[in-house]
Amino acid sequence: MNNILSEEVLNVTDFTTSRQLALWKREDLQSPQLDDVAEEVPVALVYNGISHVVMMASPKDLTHFAMGFSLSEGIIDSPREIYGMDVVPSCNGLEVQIDLSSRRFMGLKARRRALAGRTGCGVCGVEQLNDIGKPVQPLPFSQTFNLGNLDRALKHLNDFQPTGKLTGCTHAAAWVMPSGELAGGHEDVGRHVALDKLLGRRATEGEEWRQGAALVSSRASYEMVQKSAMCGVEILFAVSAATTLAVDVAERCNLTLVGFCKPGRATIYTHPQRLIAD
């Protein structure tokens, strides 16, 4: 297995496909011309030789995705419990082959169920609706964020969406430092996958990534709140709205949830005590 921080083995340098498409502009159906379309491929996460889940995703940053998914789904508690990863082609997509510690693999097998994911779905494969909510330890109140610094982050969020700029087809998730500077970010055709990539990246970065908040370009679903809380993220900013279940989960696990983030304004759903307004 490769070191978990090494480059992925696939030489994937282009995450769009050019296709002949007809364009309509003000009652004029133009001749087909080349346009960019985002790639979306099945990605299987395979733990110690056993396929656990297949998600539809953009074919990049997949080791970060696998790390973030493993943490946010409670498969592992620490990056040290994954000994290595390889990304390899499979018949119709890609596999991330994960070398998981024996103790964690036994736990995974004990709870394993048929789980087939798809973009934007957090319930797929869950046997009982009561199993949707995962037990999450209430978050501490150790973080604060000055809302006056949010504008800077919003201005640069699309810097982490190069494929999105070409296709208009990706979501972004970025880590916002207390200063408003973006430490890093990831994009994907699936908003949950983009967040998992960010959470996986954060888990393997240095101490500077412990301070700050997550920012997503999409709405905030209950699953995104739950994933953030599972990884110790205390503040989640979303460009769009939050759902009722997301608000309920955020309230219960002490996560500060903020939606409709625009320059100079935002809607604070839960736990505003972490936020400073200049």
From Swiss-Prot:
Q: Does the keyword Cytoplasm apply?
A: yes
> Which gene produces this protein?
fdhD
**Source taxon at top rank:** Bacteria
Q: Which GO terms describe its biological process?
A: Mo-molybdopterin cofactor biosynthetic process
Its primary localisation, in coarse terms, equals: cytoplasm
Q: What name appears for this protein in its UniProt entry?
A: Sulfur carrier protein FdhD
The job of this chain, per UniProt, is described as: Required for formate dehydrogenase (FDH) activity. Acts as a sulfur carrier protein that transfers sulfur from IscS to the molybdenum cofactor prior to its insertion into FDH.
Give one GO term, molecular function aspect: sulfur carrier activity
The reply on keyword Isomerase is no
Q: Which SUPFAM superfamilies match?
A: Cytidine deaminase-like
Any one cellular-component term (Gene Ontology): cytoplasm
UniProt keyword annotations, A-Z:
Cytoplasm, Molybdenum cofactor biosynthesis
